[in-house]
Amino acid sequence: STDQEIGRLLKQLDAMEVFDDTLIMFLSDNGASAEMMIRGKGHDPSQPPGSEMTHLCLGPGWSSCSNSPFRRHKIWVHEGGVGTPLVASWPNGIAARGEVRHDMGHCIDFLPTFCDVAGIPKADIPLTEGAPPLPGESLVPSFAEDGTVKRDHVYFHHEGNRALRVGD
């Protein structure tokens, strides 16, 4: 399971004595699914959840509950469909413990964040000739203080649904 494999990874980092200097960022999939369907041979409740013999569907009611307080579900571009929690751990790099940040991040921010941690300026990241500038912003400032990662906009598009988020 995911918990066991993450545990193995953390144990190995600790054994290598690099855990405290390692930035770990973990995020979930976006939004709960409102699907109500049967796939393949259907759903066998006697089998372990997540196995090939199961297909658990929440349906719109429980999906709304799972995404609460946000609206809608996976596929939709409302916050319930696109919002994803991120947990960051870096014992020697993040002084805050157990605090919540409300900055809007995006997966395109991961590379600039890791380069920032490694001391590589964004301008020094090699790009293919003619490539557009590297998107994303470092999330490192948010590790110290909420409200420090600013962006003009983020655009979402998925299965015919689209949105432009400006500010908060």
Spans of model-derived segments:
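Histidine-centered active-site microenvironments of extracellular/periplasmic hydrolases
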Residues: 11-90
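Outer-membrane beta-barrel transmembrane strands
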Residues: 1-8
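C-terminal cap/loop subdomain of S1 sulfatases and analogous C-terminal strand-loop tails that border
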Residues: 52-79, 93-103, 107-168
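A generic structural signal for well-ordered alpha-helical segments enriched in polar/charged residues
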Residues: 8-11, 116
